[in-house]
Amino acid sequence: MTKQVEIKNRDGHILRGIVNIPEDGTRFPAIVNVHGFTGNKSGYKSIYTHTARFLSEHGFASVRFDLYGNGESDGEFEDMTFTGILHDIEDIINWTKTQDFANPDKIILSGQSMGGYAAATAAPIVNPYALMLMCPGAGMWFGCKDRAEAMEAKGITKADIEGLTFPTSFNHDLFNYEPFSSAEGYNGPVLLIRGTADDLVDDATCHKYESLYNGKCNYKTIEGANHNFASAFARAELDKLMLEFLLSLIHI
């Protein structure tokens, strides 16, 4: 079953999302997925939609929202802040726990790229049952303040990203969230996945995340996969790794 849903975040803005629910049963383990920078709840070439349907067939509900300022949700892209993303994640998880399709004790937080960075940062706060990180984009933090200040020194406060207005204020806010220290404190099980052909997130970044989780992180690579897992093989492997991880924790 697929449902379109709307919720209000803590600032009163409407977030619009999609929920995929298995057909039989009442309360299911639920994956809350966070999309990447300039992305949306469907993902690159609908990869999140595909994975949500796959996991639904195996007994897992999936919750996917457009973050504030993205996709169909309220706001403009320039209104987005990293602090706001973290608040949205917490609000979405709290909403999910109240829904009759979700087991509130089995909420899994997932994210790709910037969404992975955000999910890792939010995890010590929201304490999900498990955490799944796909090529977490910690690299966007490094030099973020310097980039903003260099633009402002030239009198530029906003960039044009293929039609999306991106203000330097985002990077000033982002600077408050050093990726690895911000992720410390989560003690649950973690799945970390990277494609070996990812040119945006390197192996060292993933090993740094792996080191934070006290032996509870299962780091897997997909041979030849790029940052978006943009091949039929990569998608199938991604789905397989996620399902194996989930079933190792939760018996459906």
Name these PLM-found stretches.
Residues L15, V126-T221, A225-L249:
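The alpha/beta-hydrolase serine catalytic core
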Residues R27-G36:
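Short beta-strand element of the alpha/beta-hydrolase
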Residues T38-A52, L67, A204:
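The serine-hydrolase catalytic nucleophile loop
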Residues A52-D74:
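Conserved alpha/beta-hydrolase
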Residues D79-D100:
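Alpha/beta-hydrolase active-site loop
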Residues F101-S113:
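Alpha/beta-hydrolase fold nucleophile elbow
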